[in-house]
């Protein structure tokens, strides 16, 4: 996959209990095609949380798709948008 075609998402760190791994919850909003109601969906991603950018619970982060790092991890943190209070 070319570097400029990698998917980027913004989400909130839910868990940092695993070593070098954070769980990020990404929320997406769309309009239902038949009922025209606004629907909210959530998805959790296992993200590489190691090195210079170490996120904590509650942080808002930007993640990017990368090569498989383990059985579940295919994302890494690009930047921390907002720290938890």
From Swiss-Prot:
GO function terms (MF aspect): rRNA binding; structural constituent of ribosome
Keywords: Ribonucleoprotein, Ribosomal protein, RNA-binding, rRNA-binding
GO cellular component, one term: cytosolic small ribosomal subunit
GO biological process, one term: translation
Domain of life of the source: Bacteria
Record keyword tRNA processing present: no
PROSITE patterns given in the database record: RIBOSOMAL_S17
Family note: Belongs to the universal ribosomal protein uS17 family.
Reported function: One of the primary rRNA binding proteins, it binds specifically to the 5'-end of 16S ribosomal RNA.
Subunit structure: Part of the 30S ribosomal subunit.
Protein's recorded name: Small ribosomal subunit protein uS17
């Amino acid at each position: 996959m070319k570097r400029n075609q990698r998917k980027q998402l913004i989400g909130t760190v839910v868990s940092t209990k695993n070593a070098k791994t954070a769980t990020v919850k990404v929320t997406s909003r769309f309009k239902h095609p038949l009922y025209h109601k606004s629907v909210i969906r959530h998805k959790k991603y296992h993200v590489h949380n190691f090195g210079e950018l170490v996120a904590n619970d509650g942080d808002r982060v930007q993640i990017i798709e990368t090569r498989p790092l383990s059985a579940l991890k295919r994302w890494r943190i690009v930047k921390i948008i907002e720290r938890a209070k």
